[in-house]
């Protein structure tokens, strides 16, 4: 969904290094799932993606969504455990939610 080289650049990984490609692919899929779960909408790469036309509330992979996904991926890549010792605490999901807020569908 996101270009692997863009993900690597965001994570400050040399684009020629392939040792973490599977991990980055996993994080990219998890970030896309996070977007869909948080917004309660199906994420589509482009308008001609299968299902987009028939979806009553689709969300496109626009710059806001890409930035949110990159923030999540970068956070997960840098912090691979649930607790980080010796670091200042910063809530990355808040920045992600700020980017995704305009696209969220609130329940009935």
Q: What is each model feature region?
A:
Residues 1-108:
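Divalent metal-cofactor coordination and adjacent catalytic microenvironments
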